[in-house]
A protein has these predicted regions:
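Rossmann-fold dehydrogenase core element
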Residues: 1-4, 29
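Short coil/turn segments
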Residues: 2, 18-20, 55
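Short, charged, surface-exposed secondary-structure boundary motifs
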Residues: 7-11
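Internal alpha-helical scaffold of NAD(P)-dependent oxidoreductase catalytic cores
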Residues: 12-49, 60-99, 143
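A short glycine-threonine-serine/GTX helix/turn-capping micro-motif
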Residues: 48-59, 107
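Short, electropositive, low-hydrophobicity segments enriched in small/polar residues
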Residues: 59-61, 118-119
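NAD(P)-dependent Rossmann-like dehydrogenase/reductase catalytic/cofactor-binding core
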Residues: 84-87, 91-150
C-alpha cells in the first residue's frame, strides 16, 4: 500500500513475517523504525483492513479538505486565502485531536448548543455522512482482499 505520510515522519508500516526468525524480525523492525512506526500484524486480513483505513486514509482527509476548499471558494474567498485557511484548519484540528483524542469531548467543546457548528453537524448526521464514509472504507477493504486473492 502507498504510504505518503512517510515523507513527513508520520507513517506506520504494517507487516507480517511468518517465515523469519526473531533475530531477522528485530533487525527488520530496527531498520524500518528509522523512517516509520512499525506494527506487526497477525494476518493478511488485518493488513487488508489497515490498507483500507490507514493506507487510503490520507485520501479521505484530502477529499474532505477539498470539500472545505470548495466551500470557501463558493462563498467568494480567493484561492490563495482558501488554501491558507483550509491548511491551517486541518493542521490546527490535527493538533487538537492529538491533545484530546476523544472525538465526542472535542466536538462538545467546538459545537455550542444551538450554534452554527451544531447546525452543520446535525445536517451531516441527518444525511448519514458517517454511513457513507464507512461504506466507502468497506469497499476499499473488499478491494484489498480481492487484490490479495488474485
Amino acid at each position: 500500500m502507498t504510504n505518503l505520510t512517510i515523507s513527513k515522519n508520520k507513517a506506520f508500516l504494517f507487516y507480517i513475517m511468518k517465515y523469519l526468525n526473531k533475530k531477522d524480525i528485530k533487525k527488520t523492525e530496527e531498520f524500518i523504525s528509522l523512517f516509520a512506526n512499525v506494527k506487526k500484524c497477525k494476518d493478511e486480513k488485518q493488513i487488508d483492513m489497515l490498507t483500507a483505513l490507514y493506507g487510503s486514509g490520507p485520501a479521505y482527509y484530502v477529499f474532505f479538505n477539498e470539500i472545505i476548499n470548495n466551500a470557501f471558494l463558493n462563498m467568494g474567498f480567493n484561492k490563495k486565502d482558501t488554501i491558507l485557511y483550509t491548511n491551517n484548519l486541518m493542521l490546527g484540528t490535527s493538533k487538537l485531536i492529538q491533545e484530546e483524542p476523544k472525538a465526542e469531548k472535542l466536538l462538545r467543546s467546538i459545537a455550542s448548543k444551538g450554534g452554527t457548528t451544531e447546525a452543520a453537524l446535525t445536517q451531516l448526521k441527518k444525511n448519514r455522512v458517517d454511513a457513507l464514509i464507512n461504506k466507502a472504507i468497506k469497499q476499499a477493504y473488499k478491494k484489498s482482499r480481492k487484490i490479495l486473492l488474485k
